[in-house]
């Protein structure tokens, strides 16, 4: 990697470190997502403890954190491997944010945003997998884990030169879902729409 690419990856990490869930909850007067619900600063938890508008705002912001640096990297002349590492940097920032004691979200939306400029076919396959599993199961976490397991194969099929960095991103996603995987195994994971059924 070039020196410029390393600094640009650092920029992507810093951008990823801006936790939209925490900031939007503060602005909207909602509880701290790190202390309520699933204790995860992400769109799904904001939906649990807040409302659809706030959750949608978090989702869009988190996707843009990954999408903007990768998309801009194309025009800055970064190599394919460097673009993949920029995507990894953005996801690392979201998961381990320097501005919030390195305690961040799961990284799914940011990973989707980072992968989209790399390949819309891969992004579409990832989104389709997530939606299918979610509609069948009702578990956002299960949808994310299965998507993360399959995305490296989608990348290998459509854009093989990005397989290694994207596989690293997916390993991070699965690692961040280890608590969810244990709850799923024990049958203790909450379905996303459970909140709305209680109303």
UniProtKB/Swiss-Prot annotation:
Main subcellular localisation: membrane
According to UniProt, this protein's pathway is: Lipid metabolism; phospholipid metabolism
The domain of life is: Bacteria
Query: Which InterPro entries does the UniProt record give?
Result: G3P_acylTferase_PlsY (IPR003811)
First-tier enzyme category under EC: transferase
Membrane-related topology note: Multi-pass membrane protein
Q: Which residues form a coiled coil?
A: none
One Gene Ontology MF term: acyl-phosphate glycerol-3-phosphate acyltransferase activity
Q: What is its EC number?
A: 2.3.1.275
GO annotation terms (biological process): phospholipid biosynthetic process
Pfam families in alphabetical order: G3P_acyltransf
Reactions catalysed, semicolon-separated, are: an acyl phosphate + sn-glycerol 3-phosphate = a 1-acyl-sn-glycero-3-phosphate + phosphate
Keyword annotations: Cell inner membrane, Cell membrane, Lipid biosynthesis, Lipid metabolism, Membrane, Phospholipid biosynthesis, Phospholipid metabolism, Transferase, Transmembrane, Transmembrane helix
CC terms in the record's Gene Ontology section: plasma membrane
Segments crossing the lipid bilayer: 4-24, 56-76, 80-100, 115-135, 154-176
Compartments, record wording: Cell inner membrane
Q: Hey, which family's this protein in?
A: Belongs to the PlsY family.
Query: What does the subunit comment say?
Result: Probably interacts with PlsX.
In terms of NCBIfam families, this protein maps to: glycerol-3-phosphate 1-O-acyltransferase PlsY
Q: What does this protein do?
A: Catalyzes the transfer of an acyl group from acyl-phosphate (acyl-PO(4)) to glycerol-3-phosphate (G3P) to form lysophosphatidic acid (LPA). This enzyme utilizes acyl-phosphate as fatty acyl donor, but not acyl-CoA or acyl-ACP.
Q: In its UniProt entry, what is this protein called?
A: Glycerol-3-phosphate acyltransferase
What species is given as this protein's source?
Answer: Haemophilus influenzae (strain ATCC 51907 / DSM 11121 / KW20 / Rd)
Instruction: Point out the gene that encodes the protein.
Output: plsY
